[in-house]
Amino acid sequence: MNVKGASASGKSTMRPLQKQLAARLGVNWEHFALISPDIWRKYLLDYASLGHARKYAGALTGAEVAVIDQKLDRYMSYKGKIDQLPHLLIDRFRFDSFAADEEDGSRLLTRFGSDVFMFFMITPPEATIERAWIRGERYGRYKSVDDLLAHNVEAYSGIPDLFFTWVLRQDKRVHFEFLDNGIAEGQRPRTVAFGLNERMNILDLTCLLDIDRYRNVNIEARTPEAIYASPSSRYVAKNPEFLKQCLRRIPTVIFAEHQTGHIYARIVNGKLTHWNRRIYQLAVRDDDTRAAFESIARPAQGESSISLDDNDRLDPHQSLTLGQWGGTSLMP
């Protein structure tokens, strides 16, 4: 299991849900090794001794954490070679971790993983700033605002490449899920999209488009309003790059209404093959989101339905998702 997202996006809060997923899979949670390099910071530096400088502890250990991270990759690679690698739960910010073009150690999942679960957190940058401050007050792990915003840019720039590296693989079972964590504390994140290998189901198109928006934020912002001061971060309707790549590179992409799972479009090899205008109008109410969708998959003028009726739907009981969707929640 590999969870990716910006700093303070809620990666660690997914662990209870991942534990329940392991139970559904019949895998003993105690057999998982947790890979979370940020925890090492507290072993590298005595936070209490820093006084007022404690808020800069993260930056003061950045180089050391990078060294330990690389050593861990090599160690896990060795464990894999001797067939002693445990199940892994990977909570890492690094977006080069386990990418296909990395050196030997970082290709660990490619070489030794059989079933891979990828979780991508989509959290508004302004929310990560607030949550990071609260986390710092509670646990002493502070990050500066510009560092957090830069992490958001790196995260949302890195998600597409890492996603496509895995979703198109033929030799592994790759489950993936994008989760909206811009929700109140204590609530379950919402499933934005999910799938298995070469099929993708999109439930919240507006939130998926935020991946493009969030990677273009103003890292020098000093107010929430200034975060989206750049035009490219505010208007992605004219150029929804990540959505375009999904439709171009993933053989089957299905669009469905979030609350019911009712399907309103199916695109196969880049062509719109199924369409239900009524469900589409219920599911997509935001004008910019409609503009983004119709710029890529515009149905024929006046076409109300192509081989789809109102009963075609995705079933949450047939998925291995962690988030809320389809009007049900399988793992409270």
What are these regions (language model features)?
Residues 42-45, 99, 125-133, 186-188:
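Switch/connector loops and helix/strand junctions flanking conserved nucleotide-binding motifs
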Residues 30-32, 111-117, 171-175:
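Short glycine-/polar-rich loops that comprise or flank the Walker A/P-loop
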Residues 172-332:
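C-terminal accessory extensions appended to soluble enzyme cores
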Residues 49-52, 132-137, 192-196:
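Short secondary-structure boundary/capping segments
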Residues 2-23:
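Glycine-rich phosphate-binding P-loop
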Residues 27-108, 143-146, 156:
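Conserved nucleotide-sensing/catalytic segment adjacent to the nucleotide-binding pocket
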Residues 81-83, 161-175:
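A structural motif corresponding to the C-terminal end of an alpha-helix
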Residues 55, 113-159, 300, 307-313:
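A glycine- and Lys/Arg-enriched "phosphate-lid" helix/loop adjacent to the NTP-binding pocket
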